[in-house]
Structures are given as C-alpha cells and as structure tokens.
C-alpha cells in the first residue's frame, strides 16, 4: 500500500463539514502509543456559538503506508464513528483530515474524562448508584452498536467517557469490527484483563464478548482494578478460560442486583449471557436510569483532572530520566509505552496555541504556528522580588501577565513594553485584562504604598510627557538600558486595576500555558500563580465583543509528528 492509496483511503471518508473550520489547541488530555488527544477551541465566534461554546477533541495519529493493519483499523474506527453520530451514548464524530502523514480525527470533547481518569487520577471511588448509571449508559451504547452488527471488543473504564452533563459515552473503536449477520469472529484482540474466554480460545465469538467485558468493567469501577490484575497480562490470558468467572470480592458490600448483574455478564458460556437489549430491563440497570448523580461526580472531578494529568506527565519524565541515567537494564520495568507517550506529550505541548485549519473541500488539514513567537519569561525567584510587566495577548480564553521588567517608556499616558535587551525585536503587545485582583499584584501594590509612605516622592512642578509610571505595576525597575518603543496601547488606572485597551497589532504567540488550577471554561475570570513558569494565568469567558480573527500572514505552516 503506497502513500497515495493511504491518502485515498482516508480522504474518501471525510465528513461534509464547513468548508473551512478553524480551531486552536488548548490542552493535551491524553497520550499513548496510538498518538495524542488534544482539547481545542473554535476561534470563530459563529463556530463557538453553533457548538454551544464547547471544546472539541482532536486525535493525532501518525499513519505509515507500510502499516496496513493499523490503517485499516483506523478506517474502521472512522466508519463506525460516522455511522453512530445519532447515538448519544457514543462519542460524536466531527471529521477526519490529513496533514502529511498525520491523521486528525475530530470528535466531541468529553470534559469529565474517562472513568479510568476519575478512579485513577482523581482517586474517586464510585458508589453503587453511580456505577449503575455508568453501566446503563454503556448498555444503551452497546444496544445501538450491536443492532448495527458492530462489536466494540475493548470495553473498559478507560474507553468510557463522561461529558459535562455526566452522560456516559463509548470511545476508542480502534479494534472494533463489523460482522455479517450470524458471522462469528476469530481474531484474538482486545485488552487481556477484559477479554472474554471465547476470544482467547479462538472458538469464534460475537457481540456477547462485549457483555463479558462489561461485567469485568463493572468490577473494575467498583474495586478500582479489574479482576486478576496482580497477574501479568501475558499469563492472565491463559487463566481466564480455565478458571471460574470472577465476581465481586466482597458481595455483602453490594446489592443483590449488582451481584446478579455481574454474574449474568460473566457467564463462561456466551449463549447463557444476556444480550445488551435484555440487560436494559435488568434491575441493576433500571437503578441507573438517572444521570444527575454522574453530573455531580463530573463537577467534582473536573478541577482535579488538569492537575493530575500534569502530575502524570511529570512522573513519565522522571521515569525517562531514570532510564537515561541508570541504563535500560537497571530500569527494565519501565514500559516502552511510557517513553513513547512522553515523546507524544512533548510534541503536543509544543502545539499549544497553534491554529488548526480543517478544509473539507480539499480534505486536508493545516497546522499553523506564529512566525515570531515571544521568548519565555526570564528566570526569576518565585518570591515577591520578581518584577511584573507587560501583558501579552494569547489566542484562546487566556491572558498571561508575564514577569518581564516593568514598562518604563511612557509618553502621553501610554505604556510601551520594555524589551528584555536592546537586540530584542519581539512585538510585546498589550491587551485588555479587566480588573486584576490576584494576590501577586496586590502584594506588589501594598509594598509600593509602604515605600511611598516612608519616602514620599517629590511633587513635580511641571507635567512631563516622559514621566515613568512603571511603578504602578511593579516594585522594581530594570537595571539594563532599554530602547524607546513606539506607543502600542492606551492605559488608564482604575482603583487597584489596570484597564489596558488592546491594539490592532496583536502578537498571537505560541507559549506554554502552564498548569491551570481551575477549569478552562470558567464563568468568571480567575487568576492562579504558577511558580514553575513564573507567570500569572488569567482564564475565563471572553467579553461578548471580543472576536478572534486569524491573520495568515502572522503564521507559518508546520509539520507535526506526534
């Protein structure tokens, strides 16, 4: 299979979306050997409004012309997603695009993450009513899939997502398949701990294999790990067909309905297992008819997910450092998947702030990065001695107040940002940030007020057009000489806040947005101090009149490899 046939294979499956859809990469939400999933926001106001101001998810997958099996699995995944767009219990498909050898699969973004995220990253232990609601959503999704003769073949907590309203949705159809009526499948595929015994034995199987995986998933959610998790995957596939089916470890901790549900799903004989349609009337599934309890769970989990994902990346980095320093033999227990995932995350991190242009007419994608990105802030202490300075505009619902030296080139009430050195030609543009109430700025203002009380400045006899007002936003001044910059914005001081009006020449920089301590889509502007990147991050809803515009001249197309 050559590259042209690969291109034709995916292009024929492109969805008929808007001729040109533009969104911006906001956050890395998942990564593995398959590639990386990023959360993205629409840049155009009309697109944001038509999509309910919701983020979307973009899955980046590297395609290789020689890897025929992987390409065919991707094709099946796209076909199944396209055919399932009218089922609310399956993640919604938005489109598929090609960028060189990079395949972009665009789907709805489930803000609550996966069940695995919730029980593993957030440390949540679900109560029985929550487990019943999750299983009810999975069963309804399976009813739809099985009616289309589709077998998922990889049901597990990591592939069950929750949207913002707490609705469970099936995802990751990479190993799913569509069979002819009455046809048995023979391919041994899936995740070992969740695989049905008939799959392992090679006896031929049908959609009842998903019912077994559902029973294992129910135990996984209840007990945080699947049965036999202490057995290596290479050995567990030999024990599953030859041992009695698993059950809940402490049956008395759960209702008779839950115990019976697990027992029926985990019948060794697939003919004795109920179908997904039959499970809809099971008392345990009927107990999970309300999704409100899951919405409460999602609301509690969302603030923790960003922090825990960043922590997981740090752990991968530590494992990689340990591998490099100790040698491969000393740390052979570190899986190679972790190394690949870390590489994927690093590559995806570099795409934050980049703009993705999806064109359904040409059936291609373009990934654009700013031609003149701003340099990272200079290294400062995280104490109060750091200097605050110019604010720069970043695409996305964020404004970042970087700790650059304070602005000191002022004329006619205008602040001109100071460069880091005389050779710096970056366009440090300012923007409107509204009322600033961060403890960081308040501390600086209080310290400045104390200094003024001790040493009151002399009252000027005549107004000077070059009067320095940089001390209004910083307690220190730069020691290096600066070059006078042209006026770029108009600033007025209102109480303890700065109202900086944006200019037309906006520098859309690609920067690291750091670790955000609260949800991205907040109803109010909030501030959080990130000691690692030494910056104050503001995020929240943009003003009604604030409309993102994309200027192609400010960007250049890049190749990506995630």
Swiss-Prot record:
Annotated region described as Disordered, given as residue ranges: 316-339, 366-562
Cellular component annotations (GO), alphabetically ordered: cytoplasm; nucleus
Ranges of Polar residues composition bias in the record: 322-339, 495-522
Protein EC: 2.7.11.1
Active site: 154 (proton acceptor)
A Pfam short name: Pkinase
An MF annotation (GO) of this entry: protein serine kinase activity
Cofactor: Mg(2+)
Biased composition (Low complexity): 421-431, 442-454, 476-494
Composition bias, Acidic residues: 542-562
InterPro entries: Kinase-like_dom_sf (IPR011009), Prot_kinase_dom (IPR000719), Protein_kinase_ATP_BS (IPR017441), STE20/SPS1-PAK (IPR050629)
Alphabetical keyword list: ATP-binding, Kinase, Magnesium, Metal-binding, Nucleotide-binding, Serine/threonine-protein kinase, Transferase
Reaction(s) catalysed (UniProt annotation): L-seryl-[protein] + ATP = O-phospho-L-seryl-[protein] + ADP + H(+); L-threonyl-[protein] + ATP = O-phospho-L-threonyl-[protein] + ADP + H(+)
Keyword presence, Transferase: yes
GO BP: intracellular signal transduction; negative regulation of canonical Wnt signaling pathway; positive regulation of apoptotic process; programmed cell death; protein phosphorylation; regulation of MAPK cascade; signal transduction
Domain Protein kinase: 23-285
Positions that bind ATP: 29-37, 59
Family of this protein: Belongs to the protein kinase superfamily. STE Ser/Thr protein kinase family. STE20 subfamily.
Protein name per Swiss-Prot or TrEMBL: Serine/threonine-protein kinase dst3
């Amino acid at each position: 299979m050559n590259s042209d046939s690969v291109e034709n294979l995916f292009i024929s499956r492109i969805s008929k979306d808007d001729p040109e859809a533009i969104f911006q990469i906001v956050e890395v939400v998942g990564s593995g050997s398959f590639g990386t999933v990023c959360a993205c926001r629409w840049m155009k106001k009309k697109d944001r409004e038509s999509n309910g101001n919701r983020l979307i998810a973009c899955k980046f997958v590297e395609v290789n012309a020689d890897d025929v099996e992987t390409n065919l699995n991707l094709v099946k995944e796209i076909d199944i997603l396209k055919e399932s767009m009218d089922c609310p219990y399956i993640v919604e498909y938005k489109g598929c695009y090609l960028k060189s050898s990079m395949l972009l699969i665009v789907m709805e973004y489930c803000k609550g993450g996966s069940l695995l995220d919730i029980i593993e990253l957030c440390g949540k232990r679900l109560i029985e009513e929550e487990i019943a609601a999750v299983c009810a959503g999975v069963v309804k999704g399976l009813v739809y899939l099985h009616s289309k003769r589709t077998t998922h073949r990889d049901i597990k907590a990591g592939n069950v997502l929750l949207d913002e309203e707490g609705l469970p949705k099936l995802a990751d159809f990479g190993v799913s398949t569509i069979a002819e009526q009455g046809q048995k499948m023979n391919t041994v595929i899936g995740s070992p701990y969740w695989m049905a015994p008939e799959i392992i034995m090679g006896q031929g199987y049908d959609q009842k294999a998903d019912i077994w995986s559902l029973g294992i998933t129910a135990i996984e959610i209840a007990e945080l790990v699947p049965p036999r998790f202490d057995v290596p995957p290479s050995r567990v596939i030999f024990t599953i067909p030859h041992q009695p089916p698993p059950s809940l470890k402490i049956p008395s901790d759960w209702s008779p309905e839950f115990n019976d549900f697990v027992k029926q799903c985990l019948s060794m004989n697939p003919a004795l297992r109920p179908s997904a349609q039959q499970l809809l009337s099971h008392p345990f599934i009927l107990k999970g008819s309300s999704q409100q309890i899951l919405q409460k769970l999602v609301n509690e989990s969302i603030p923790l997910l960003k922090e825990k994902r960043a922590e997981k990346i740090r752990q991968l980095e530590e494992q990689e450092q340990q591998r490099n320093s100790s040698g491969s033999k000393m740390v052979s227990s570190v899986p190679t998947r972790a190394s690949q995932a870390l590489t994927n995350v690093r590559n995806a991190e570099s795409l934050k702030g980049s703009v993705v242009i999806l064109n359904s007419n040409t059936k291609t994608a373009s990934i654009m990065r700013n031609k003149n990105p701003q340099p990272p802030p200079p290294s400062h202490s995280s104490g109060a001695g750091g200097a605050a300075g110019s604010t720069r505009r970043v695409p996305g619902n964020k404004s970042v107040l970087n700790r650059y030296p304070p602005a000191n080139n002022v004329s006619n009430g205008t602040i001109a940002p100071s460069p880091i050195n005389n050779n710096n030609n970056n366009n440090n543009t300012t923007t409107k940030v509204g009322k600033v109430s961060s403890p960081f700025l308040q501390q600086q203002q209080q310290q400045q007020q104390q200094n003024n009380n001790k040493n009151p400045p002399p009252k000027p006899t005549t107004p000077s057009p070059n009067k320095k007002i940089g001390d209004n936003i910083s307690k220190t001044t730069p020691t290096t000489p600066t070059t006078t910059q042209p006026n770029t914005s108009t600033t007025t001081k209102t109480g303890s806040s700065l109202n900086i009006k944006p200019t037309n020449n906006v520098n859309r920089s690609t920067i690291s947005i750091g670790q955000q301590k609260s949800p991205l889509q907040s109803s109010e502007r909030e501030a959080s101090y990130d000691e690692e990147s030494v910056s104050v991050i503001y995020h929240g809803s943009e003003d009604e009149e604030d409309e993102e515009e994309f200027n192609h001249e400010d960007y250049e197309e890049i190749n990506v490899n995630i």
